[in-house]
Amino acid sequence: MRYRTVLFDLDGTLIDSGEIILSSFRHATNTVLGRRIPDEVLAAAVGGSNIYDQMRAFDEERVDELVRVYREHNEPLHDDLVAFEGIERVLERFEAEGRQLGIVTAKRRKTVDLAFAILPLERYFETVVTSEQTAHHKPHPEPVLTALDRLGSSPGEAAFVGDSPFDMGAGKAAGVFTVAVSWGKIHPVERLRETGADTVVDSPEELLDVL
C-alpha cells in the first residue's frame, strides 16, 4: 500500500455523469442565452468551482437564471446515473485493505445525495467535501486539505484521483500524489497530461497498481 488515504472526485471519476452535465449546460445556455456554445467550451468549465462560478463564465448578468435552468434539467437525470465499470470493485479492495477513502467534489451536498440515492457508493467513504463546505474551490487546495484534516491524514500519505485539470491543480497545490483518469468523457486526456499529473490511468483496475 503506497497511500493510506485516497481521495476521489465524483463526476467523471466515480460516476458516469459527463453527458448529463454537458446536456444540462447545453440546455441552460440555449434556453437562457439563446445561443449554442461549443461543447469544448462548456466542458472547460466543468469540475472546478461551484456551479455559480462555472456559469459566470458564460454570462455575468444571468448567473442565477442559468443555474436555475441547469438544475431543473440536471436533477431529474440523476435517476439514470451509473458508476463506471470496475469502480466498485476497486473501492471494495481499498476498503478491505483498510484505507481511508474520501470524496472531494464541486457538487453541493443535495446533488451528491441524489447520486447516492441511486448508487450504493457512499458507504465506502469516511468523508465527502462538497462545494458549500469550503470558502475556496478546486483548483485551490482547500477542499483537498479539508478532506485530509477530517481524516487525520497528511499530504505525504495521500493521493487524489480525478478527471479534470481542476482536480490535478488542487491535488498538486495540496502536495498529494495526483492520478488523472482518462475515462471521464469531459476533459481530453491530452489536457490532463499537460496538467503535470503524477500519473494517468486508463481503467479503474490500474488504480490498484499505482496506489
Task: Indicate residue ranges for each PLM-predicted region.
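Conserved SAM-binding loop
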Residues: L14, A44, A83, L101, ...
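N-terminal helical cap/lid subdomain that shapes the substrate entry/recognition surface
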Residues: R2-R89, R93-E97
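Acidic, Mg2+-coordinating phosphoryl-transfer loop and its flanking beta/alpha structural elements
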Residues: A159-T199
